[in-house]
A protein has these predicted regions:
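Generic protein-terminus/edge-of-domain signal
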Residues: 1-57, 64, 96
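Histidine-centered metal-chelating micro-motifs
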Residues: 59, 63-69, 88-89
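Helix N-cap / beta->alpha transition motif
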Residues: 18, 62, 84-86
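Short, Lys/Arg-enriched, Trp-marked, Pro/Gly-tolerant hinge/linker segments that flank
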Residues: 110-119, 136-149, 156-185
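ATP/adenylate-binding site constellation spanning eukaryotic-like Ser/Thr protein kinases
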Residues: 39, 74, 175
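A hydrophobic/aromatic-rich effector-binding and dimerization subdomain
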Residues: 2-10, 70-137, 157-164
């Protein structure tokens, strides 16, 4: 499962990988990177921040990010989507700034056991299934249009999930505030 990940791509790429090529040193990705952890655990660093990944965790960097895997379990596996900056810039035009701000501030999201979050987890796996179907060895005269349509659809779908993610973050903050208040700290 050792897959070499280039720092940029001219087409959308889908991979299932253990990110082994990112263990020895950081790599600067010009393209966008979106991954979902389907098995195992890892700690991923951007040089500024570290993210603990486990099953049902999403991590997205829209473009231009430094990424290194600091440590990973032997069974660590992600489904990864790489998308060219040019396709991203075209696809993101109709999407509002709050989405971009949110993904910049909160690139990592861990799904919870609640029904809504589990439904979203199944849906993101469907998006990854579509990416695999469309972009793994498929040569089509409509490839450019498929990439644009796919990425714009994915980004709009992600934008629609932000409310759910914000509600969860607010619940976590509220729980911490309640815990601190009740314990007298």
């Amino acid at each position: 499962m050792a897959v070499f990940l280039p720092s940029d791509t001219s087409t959308i790429r889908y991979e299932e990988t253990d990110l082994a090529s990112l263990h020895s040193r950081p790599s600067h990705f010009v393209c966008g990177v979106y991954l979902i952890c389907v098995r195992g655990t890892a700690v991923v660093s951007t040089g500024v921040q570290q993210y603990a990944l486990g099953e049902q965790t999403e991590l997205i960097f829209l473009t231009g990010s430094l990424i290194q895997v600091l440590c990973a379990s032997d069974d660590f596996t992600v489904r990864l989507l790489m998308f060219p900056k040019e396709v991203f810039l075209k696809a993101v035009l109709p999407i509002d700034t709050p989405y971009l701000n949110y993904t910049h501030e909160h690139p990592c999201y861990r799904h919870t056991e609640d029904e809504r979050s589990q439904a979203t987890w199944l849906q993101i796996n469907l998006w990854m299934d579509m990416a695999q179907m469309l972009f793994c060895g498929n040569v089509s005269p409509f490839r450019q249009q498929q990439e644009y349509n796919f990425l714009q659809g994915l980004l709009m779908w992600l934008f629609n999930t932000i409310q759910e993610k914000l509600e969860r973050i607010l619940q976590e903050i509220s729980g911490v505030e309640t815990e601190v208040f009740c314990s007298g700290r």
